[in-house]
Amino acid sequence: MCGILGGTNKNWNYKEGIWSLHHRGPDAQQVKEFDDCTLAFARLAIIDLSEKGMQPMTSLDGTVSIVYNGEIYGYDFLKKELEKKYLFQSNTDTEVILNAYLEYGEDFINKIDGMFSFAIYDKRKHQIILYRDRPGIKPLYYYHANGQFAFASELKALVTGCTDVKWDMDYTALYDYLFYQYIPEPKTMYKNCYKLPPAHRLVFDLKEKRIVSIKKYWKMHVNTSKGIYRKEDVLWDELRTI
């Protein structure tokens, strides 16, 4: 696993924030400042151990950058399709996501399968776009208040890195934890800080300084025509025989 972090306030301590994710990415850490935001990455080198696999990774035309944690299944097949148009500098699935986004736009997410959470900085649109995998295997948190925005693989990276933020406890989340023994999404223990739900896409506009959309990009299809749903007494009888 790797760790990702990013935000809009250039005065935040991204080095300390990404170092707090050292256990997720012990091989290397890197912070890179862009025009509208800062991206940081803690690397666990698995695919393409060379420096070419380091993140944040930027497209060859310089318009789109990414920080990514996860694994894309069968990415080689998509890479072969994209190689007809794009020149690849690495053997990573990270670069496949990057070029798929350039080629297909929002629809690129339908081309990939796997466990992932990542952030794309689109310089052309002045947007940060977050994605989380369909089953929610890889975590992704975000903070938004007073026009400021940040995201990270773990909550403590936000608390450590966003140095001027007042982290007030959300007591409704505390109640949920005491009642359910966990905090339901999208809440976290802090106000203005949330978990991005599984299979969701978030778009933050860097010019307007606001979240313009949080949308579900995938929905599980259940085939009800094969007798999955049966009468309650039948189900109870089956349960007793187990």
Task: Tell where the protein language model's regions lie, with residue ranges.
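Cysteine-centered catalytic environments shared across enzyme families
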Residues: M1-I242
